[in-house]
Amino acid sequence: MTKDRLAALQAAQSDDEDMPEDVAVPVEGSFMEDFFKEVEEIRMMIDKIQANVEEVKKKHSAILSAPQSDEKTKQELEDLMADIKKTANRVRGKLKGIEQNIEQEEQQSKSNADLRIRKTQHSALSRKFVEVMTEYNRTQTDYRERCKGRIQRQLEITGRATTNEELEEMLEQGNSAVFTQGIIMETQQAKQTLADIEARHADIIKLENSIRELHDMFMDMAMLVESQGEMIDRIEYHVEHAMDYVQTATQDTKKALKYQSKARRKKIWIAICVLIAIIILVVFLAIYLT
């Protein structure tokens, strides 16, 4: 392999001497350099989504803890959600592109170290992406439940208690009037309660639209990661067993060295005993013959 690379470099150098100076010569490995740049770009986008998800959580808490609807905070929340959606679609597109390139090379029966590296990187990025989007989905679902709880408490204040099932039925109708009918708005508090109920209902509608928009993308990536799971598990299995084999081999080597050392010492002791026996025999014969 080293000789082949050396020959290729020498050939490239020879060709370069015959070329004009302004002609660019492709450098071996430039494809993988571009790939790793793309990997880093995808990783940074996923990190950006993760950071935005944390900001979304803060906005949710700020909105729910505010006594009155804060339009500025709501707009900031919508901007964050729009940015997450935009970035997530870009990540999905890039991961899909890498996946298609890998599949094309596999169909051409290409198998090399670079391909395995790309598959491993693609799998790691896909898993990370799904983890981040799962957290985002969980954040949205949690916010929806908290908005429901807020509506339920406000309805109780107005004297209209509702069960969770009844509240879900009202939400499915998509009309805030079903929540506010029968509420007498004679006081400022009643008006504020009505406004809060309508605001929370509007938040839930936006959340449900956002969840639906991201659902297909989320399921697509989740299925991809699941299909990669068996391959990754097999790789981890073989790596673990390889490590076990190395550890076992190391222990066996230590045992062999230990046994070899014992055997060597035993041979030395036997030689010493034989030598002593010979000396005793010589002395005995010398005395006897004398």
Curated annotation (Swiss-Prot):
Question: Which residues of this protein are annotated with the site description (Microbial infection) Cleavage?
Answer: E240, H241
Membrane-related topology note: Single-pass type IV membrane protein
| Effect on the protein upon substituting M243V | Very poorly cleaved in vitro by PMP1 LC
**Keyword presence, Isomerase:** no
- Domain (t-SNARE coiled-coil homology): give its ranges: 194-256
Keyword terms of this UniProt record: Cytoplasmic vesicle, Membrane, Neurotransmitter transport, Synapse, Transmembrane, Transmembrane helix, Transport
Q: Provide the GO biological process annotations.
A: exocytosis; intracellular protein transport; neurotransmitter transport; vesicle docking; vesicle fusion
In terms of Gene3D superfamilies, this protein maps to: 1.20.5.110, 1.20.58.70
**Stretches in topological domain Cytoplasmic:** 1-267
Location within or outside the cell: Cytoplasmic vesicle, Secretory vesicle, Synaptic vesicle membrane
Q: Which InterPro entries match?
A: SNARE (IPR010989), Syntaxin (IPR045242), Syntaxin/epimorphin_CS (IPR006012), Syntaxin_N (IPR006011), T_SNARE_dom (IPR000727)
| Chain ranges on the Vesicular side, renumbered to this chain | 290
What GO MF annotations does this protein's record show? SNAP receptor activity; SNARE binding
What GO cellular component is one of the record's annotations?
endomembrane system
Q: Which Pfam families match?
A: SNARE (PF05739), Syntaxin (PF00804)
Region Disordered: list its residue ranges.
Answer: 1-21
Membrane-spanning intervals of the chain: 268-289
Posttranslational mods:
(Microbial infection) Targeted and hydrolyzed by the light chain (LC) of P.bifermentans PMP1. Cleavage probably inhibits neurotransmitter release.
Outline what the protein does: Plays a critical role in several secretory processes.
Family to which this protein belongs: Belongs to the syntaxin family.
Q: What is this protein called?
A: Syntaxin-1A
Organism of origin is Anopheles gambiae
